[in-house]
Amino acid sequence: MIQMQSVLDVADNSGARRVMCIKVLGGSHRRYAAIGDIIKVTVKEAIPRGKVKKGDVHSAVVVRTRKGVRRPDGAVIRFDRNAAVMLNANNQPIGTRIFGPVTRELRNEKFMKIVSLAPEVL
C-alpha cells in the first residue's frame, strides 16, 4: 500500500535511488497504490550522471510492496521493500535494466517491457 509521502526504492538504472510518492493516479480521491499502479514521484536521491536528477518529477509504476498481492489460488506474494520503476511520458521505462524480482501481475497491466527486462518473475 503506497500512499502520498511514501518513500520507495528504484528498481532500474535510470539514475534515481530513492523516490517519494506525491500522487496516486487513477480516481479523484484515490488513497493507496498497489503493484501495477502508476504513481507520480519526485526523486529524493540520485546518482551522479544519471538520466534523472534529484528534484525531478516523473511517473513510476509500483513493482514491489511490503503489503504484497493476493493470487486467485490464495497465495500472497510479499517483498521486504517497496520499489518502483521510473516511466517516461509514454509510460515506457526510462532505464534499460530492471533489478530484483517483479510479479506476474505487471503482465496484465500492459508493462510487458518491464516483465521482459526483469531477471525474475514471480
UniProtKB/Swiss-Prot annotation:
NCBIfam families: rplN_bact. The keyword Ribosomal protein applies. It holds the Pfam family Ribosomal_L14. One of its GO terms (molecular function) is structural constituent of ribosome. Part of the 50S ribosomal subunit. Forms a cluster with proteins L3 and L19. In the 70S ribosome, L14 and L19 interact and together make contacts with the 16S rRNA in bridges B5 and B8. Binds to 23S rRNA. Forms part of two intersubunit bridges in the 70S ribosome. GO terms for cellular component: cytosolic large ribosomal subunit. The gene is rplN. Belongs to the universal ribosomal protein uL14 family. GO terms for biological process: translation. Keywords: Ribonucleoprotein, Ribosomal protein, RNA-binding, rRNA-binding. This is Large ribosomal subunit protein uL14. It comes from Psychromonas ingrahamii (strain DSM 17664 / CCUG 51855 / 37). The keyword Iron does not apply.
